[in-house]
Amino acid sequence: MTGPLRKNHPLFSIINNSLIDLPSPSNLSIWWNFGSLLGLCLIIQILTGLFLAMHYTSDVSLAFSSVSHICRDVNYGWLLRNIHANTASFFFLCLYFHIGRGIYYGSYVNNETWNIGVILLLLTMLTAFVGYVLPWGQMSFWGATVITNLISAVPYIGSSIVQWVWGGFSVDNATLTRFFAFHFLFPFIIAALSIIHLFFLHQTGSNNPTGIESKFDKTPFHTYFSTKDITGFIILFMLLSSIVLLSPNLLNDPENFNPANPLVTPIHIQPEWYFLFAYAILRSIPNKLGGVVALLASILVLFLVPFLHTSNNQANTFRPASQSLFWLLTSVFIILTWLGSQPVEDPFILLGQISSIAYFALFFLAFPLASELENKLIF
């Protein structure tokens, strides 16, 4: 057998075709780095999570103490815990950039890749939610109580489902144990789905910043884009290590340094920053079921993006009206994130309702209408 081993070996050839000799568009920008950064974040989370799980105890009377024990007594336990907690924030930051790039450059036209990506987003959000409950601090306990209690809004069977999820009549030991089991299991499902995500991506080939077919302008992934990805890794490590070593609790809620107490409700219950946009949409509707539907719709709307694409151009690169709307959507997303961290009082209630309407109106009305207008002006 002649030729390099990486091309002839049954296992190495798969890796070679995915990471080394993969034909890639020659004009990919930095916005295509976030997929590999997400893979890196997932690996960091699985490794640090594995070592944390060795010392963690999923019992309501011991969970908070076990996290304290990890930080105080385990060799570099403080570092593991801080890396795990802060990489979650970087994970979601990269995830939102990745989705934003997909919307801006029209990557959603590859339906299978996009749909699996949205499923990955939902699974990652679920994993982060159950993980946030594990330290069993005040915000962990009350966050779990409030968010799981939303299921009771489902007509007729809601209350039964909530008790089934809790494993009892309140958030207690059974809830913590099963949440730990889910938090351990889901990252491996995410890893498996990520491979399928890549498989579908490599069936169609990557999109590029122009949104124009690039079959005749390809370049090998290695060394050009692998070097570019490693540059992204170095920048991520620098930012992550700066936060982990200089200000590890910058993104944490101070309330979570108090052990869970079912008798004392925190003044302001809120999730981590990466869920605040959806939380703001939930709170903006003065009806429990309506709020839950809006909360789910704020994420599930991504499934509809390919069907709402009416433009003759794939990317927004040559579509100024759609570009303006995209940056308006980004602004609305940031405003919703800020509103989610504010108390439920005027003027934040009204601002939340306006921003929520704007969020959905951009997806369902503004983008399709702007695309139709651009079609008439350009073609």
UniProtKB/Swiss-Prot annotation:
Query: This protein's superkingdom?
Result: Eukaryota
Keyword Isomerase listed:
no
Q: How does it sit in the membrane?
A: Multi-pass membrane protein
Naming one, the record's GO cellular component terms include: respiratory chain complex III
GO molecular function, one example? Answer: ubiquinol-cytochrome-c reductase activity
Swiss-Prot/TrEMBL cofactor(s): heme b
Q: Where are the transmembrane segments?
A: 34-54, 78-99, 114-134, 179-199, 227-247, 289-309, 321-341, 348-369
Quote the cofactor binding remark: Binds 2 heme b groups non-covalently.
Alphabetical GO biological process terms? mitochondrial electron transport, ubiquinol to cytochrome c
Q: Which residues are listed for a ubiquinone binding in this entry?
A: 202
Per the record's keyword annotation, is Mitochondrion included, yes or no?
yes
**What SUPFAM superfamilies would the database entry show?**
a domain/subunit of cytochrome bc1 complex (Ubiquinol-cytochrome c reductase), Transmembrane di-heme cytochromes
Q: Which PANTHER family match?
A: CYTOCHROME B (PTHR19271:SF16)
Please explain the role this protein plays, according to its UniProt record: Component of the ubiquinol-cytochrome c reductase complex (complex III or cytochrome b-c1 complex) that is part of the mitochondrial respiratory chain. The b-c1 complex mediates electron transfer from ubiquinol to cytochrome c. Contributes to the generation of a proton gradient across the mitochondrial membrane that is then used for ATP synthesis.
Q: What else is known?
A: Heme 1 (or BL or b562) is low-potential and absorbs at about 562 nm, and heme 2 (or BH or b566) is high-potential and absorbs at about 566 nm.
Q: Which family does it belong to?
A: Belongs to the cytochrome b family.
Name of the molecule in the record: Cytochrome b
Source organism (scientific name): Patiria pectinifera
Gene that encodes it: MT-CYB
